[in-house]
Amino acid sequence: LFEEAIDWVELDENGLMSGPILEPASRIPEKELNPATLEPQLNIEQVYQALVSGIRDYFGKMGFTKAILGSSGGIDSAVTLAIACEALGADNVRAILMPSPYSTEHSVNDAVALSKNLNNPYDIVQIDQVYNSFLKTLDPLFNGLPFSLAEENIQSRSRGNILMAIANKFGYVLLNTSNKSELATGYGTLYGDMAGGLGVLGDCYKLQVYELAKYINRISEIIPQHIISKPPSAELRPNQKDSDSLPDYEVLDKLLYQYIEKRQSPANIKEQGFDAALVDRTIKMVNNNEYKRNQFCPIIRISPKAFGVGRRMPIVGKYLS
């Protein structure tokens, strides 16, 4: 008996109202209120320039002048350091190398070589003593239990504390080096390697980080080739590799892109040929780690679906499929 009505006003080229003011809802033409997210249009040079501008703009507007970051000898910290040096000047970016009992010698050497190539100041701070002190303190509780993620994360959080202490003492801003693939899957330690005041690579998938490294090296080798070619590893336990915990990035990044940027359902992603079990596992990781991303620092946005400002999701994602 009743049909809702909508005020539908059309203006002609002179700004005058034309047509009926009131129409039944069934006669109102359908309008797409939420257009589909646009495909990313940035090439790798534009991504690089956007990140440089993002750091420079953020620091300039906030009145910051100097940055600090943890330099591990890995691809993420290497790319972040190179971009920060371009944005702020090498003299204003301090790299802190923090080897642990599980750090390889080549990672330390790679990190040193990188800072020498960039001509930025760096320091080496061993965390063995801090790490062992934690283990000794926790021994009454951990005694007899096998080595696990808890011991791994102590190393990461020790580094986070050291970086923040130096930042506080000397007035630096800590740059975070986590990439979008890691943030999506929760492959990071809260209050450890997720600490920071600005996430430089937080909207860049892992494969984009490799492309950025190649772009940075387009004229001469700034990032040592060994950093680019070696298998990525957090080096928190013997012989650790990212592939122990995550799918291959060639597959993972494409899957994540379909779920996050394209907003495809698990069923649609599986129809594209992705392994069903891998899709379920990956999407579960994404949904279950919203609480981590909710505590992450601001991210430089280069896509329509950057975590935080571009993708608002409830922390409890149990209902998501």
Where are these regions (language model features)?
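ATP/NTP-dependent adenylation/nucleotidyl-transfer catalytic domains that generate, transfer
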Residues: D12-G73, S77-S321
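CN hydrolase (nitrilase-like) catalytic-core segments centered on the catalytic cysteine
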Residues: L1-D7
